[in-house]
Amino acid sequence: MREHSLRPIGTAVWAACASKLYICVFFLCVASLTSLRAQTLPLSHGERVDYDLYFKWGLIMSKAGLATLSVKESEYQGAPSWHYNLLFRSAGVIEKVFRMRDTMDCHYSKEPRLLFSSKRTNEGDYYLVDNLQFEYQGSGRIDIHSHRHTLKETKIDTMLMAKGRVFDMLGATMYLRSLDWRTMSYGAEFPFMIAIGRELVNARFRYTGQQIVEHKEAKFRTRHFYIDIYDEAFSQAKE
């Protein structure tokens, strides 16, 4: 397993990164879920939330796409599971410049443990699938089979090993949702790792209190989180 330094290279919130739009989708999921009170996987079959996504860079803020996040009861390898799904498609200026149709799926056991995740990237003529399969050993070790491929060839086929909390990008939002925010204090930190290709990237959620958000003449009391990512691939992310 690769060693990672704990120097925070990037700190990000939704719509803060100009180079990787899928990161913005992930951050928006995190930010949007913070308006809910969290218990241990407080899920209901058939939950669905639709998002309008905006791309922000400096003073420019333009509509970037549409996303749908849904949860339903399902099965994975014959056992009951939660199926967590995110569909994204670009819109507005982004659609004209760089067409995107991305899908992310997770299967969680009822315990809960992340069992499987898949990200399917469809961007113009580019199509890529990232699959992660998680197996939990008695010693506390987690074995992760990472398989990345296009329609023509395999890009990555390797095993990752870790201990502690490990998720894909979408599964990390499920972890955030499972935290008990009622007893959370300002500055609380929750470290974890994100499995991406051959890498295990160190990250953490950082709680910075409640915030009132106004939208379409309505006010919402939300919980405000940052995600700190300790990897050079996210060095352009910023607050």
Regions found by a protein language model. Give the residues of each.
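N-terminal cleavable signal peptides for secretion/export
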Residues: 36-103, 119-127, 187, 192-194, ...
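Gly/Pro-enriched, hydrophobic low-complexity segments
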Residues: 99-101, 105-116, 215-216, 222-239
